[in-house]
A protein has these predicted regions:
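Amphipathic, Lys/Arg-enriched alpha-helical "gate/interface" segment within cytosolic domains
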Residues: 1-131
């Protein structure tokens, strides 16, 4: 399951469960339509806490989607996860798509303020990795 919400900072994406290629393609198409009306610069918050590891065919669609968000004006993004495998997958995808330097990863199991931490990165450039 996925959901895309528009927020004052940009887009809040929620993914949960097992995302097959067909559903990922639906997300991709919906994202393309939304991005046609996107502001020049925006952030993306991705809540993946309840998502299962992505199959390879879904990963490739996600990679194309991330490229589109970046090309349409994404300046920063944050990914919130609860599991090691999806964390590794999304770091690899971000490196492949060229957005790694603008993306931060938050482990919700060890950061109780994961949502506030993520929004602070998107809106105010407060880096959650800076200690």
């Amino acid at each position: 399951m996925y959901k895309i919400e528009q927020k004052d900072f940009g887009y809040y994406l929620t993914f949960s469960g097992f995302i097959k290629k067909e559903e990922m393609e639906e997300w991709y198409k919906e994202s393309l339509a939304l991005l046609e009306k996107a502001p020049a610069h925006f952030g993306v918050f991705a809540d993946l806490r309840d998502m299962k590891p992505l199959p390879a065919e879904s990963q490739s669609v996600m990679e194309e989607g991330q490229k589109n968000y970046k090309q349409k004006g994404m300046v920063r993004s944050v990914v919130v996860l609860n599991s090691a495998i999806p964390t590794m997958q999304f770091k690899r995808i971000a490196k492949t798509t060229g957005i790694y330097q603008w993306e931060r990863y938050i482990d919700a199991s060890s950061n109780k303020d994961w949502e506030a931490t993520g929004i602070a990165w998107i809106k105010d450039e407060i880096d959650p990795d800076a200690k």
